[in-house]
């Protein structure tokens, strides 16, 4: 497989949807970003794409209530899933979000990778583990980003990385763990490399259409 380097700075917003029934057709390739409401998911997307306002950041956790799609190039999409685990959201809303998350992860055939973001100081909460379990159950590879790595000293950061890497062994899945910081740009290259690898598995017919378009 040839790994293609994508220009994530060209990423643009496509649509917001309450559930998978309102998403575009299940084709091409998608990589989803999931995480607790305060895990730094929007900041990570903005850092990845070098666009400050691509994914909305908020001082109020739980603002991402919809599935937000962003297109890198034709047929290649990043998906910002609803943040989970925010205590002040009504229980009915929490359950609705969790249903939407589970349905997307288990039924969206074009999903080729899942990025789960967790605060490095508080990793692998119950809902984080649920995301991993859903992904592993359908054979979706996972990249765990331990965010806000700048909050810890180097030694403590490495210790947390090792702890999480050991803790995920029982999941028996294709799971990679990396430290990440939007502020200090830690782990951004690792994220891009993983996305490039996943997106290079794009169906040949989509890739052919894309290159035909470039030649016009």
Swiss-Prot record:
**SUPFAM superfamilies associated with the record:** P-loop containing nucleoside triphosphate hydrolases (SSF52540)
- Domain (EngB-type G): give its ranges: 27-201
List the keywords (alphabetical): Cell cycle, Cell division, GTP-binding, Magnesium, Metal-binding, Nucleotide-binding, Septation
**Residues bound to Mg(2+):** 42, 64
Q: What is this protein called?
A: Probable GTP-binding protein EngB
What positions does the entry give for GTP binding? 35-42, 62-66, 80-83, 147-150, 180-182
Q: Which residues cross the membrane?
A: none
Respond yes or no to whether keyword Mitochondrion is given for this record: no
One of the GO BP terms on file: division septum assembly
Q: Which family is this protein grouped under?
A: Belongs to the TRAFAC class TrmE-Era-EngA-EngB-Septin-like GTPase superfamily. EngB GTPase family.
What CDD domains does this protein map onto?
Answer: YihA_EngB (cd01876)
PANTHER family for the chain: ENGB-TYPE G DOMAIN-CONTAINING PROTEIN, MSS1/TRME-RELATED GTP-BINDING PROTEIN
A GO cellular-component term linked to this record: cytosol
Q: Which InterPro entries match?
A: G_ENGB_dom, GTP-bd, GTP-bd_ribosome_bio_YsxC, P-loop_NTPase
Q: Does the keyword Nuclease apply?
A: no
Pfam families in the record, alphabetically?
MMR_HSR1 (PF01926)
Q: What function does the entry list?
A: Necessary for normal cell division and for the maintenance of normal septation.
GO molecular-function terms, A-Z: GTP binding; metal ion binding
User: Which co-factors does it depend on?
Assistant: Mg(2+)
Q: What highest taxon heads this organism's lineage?
A: Bacteria
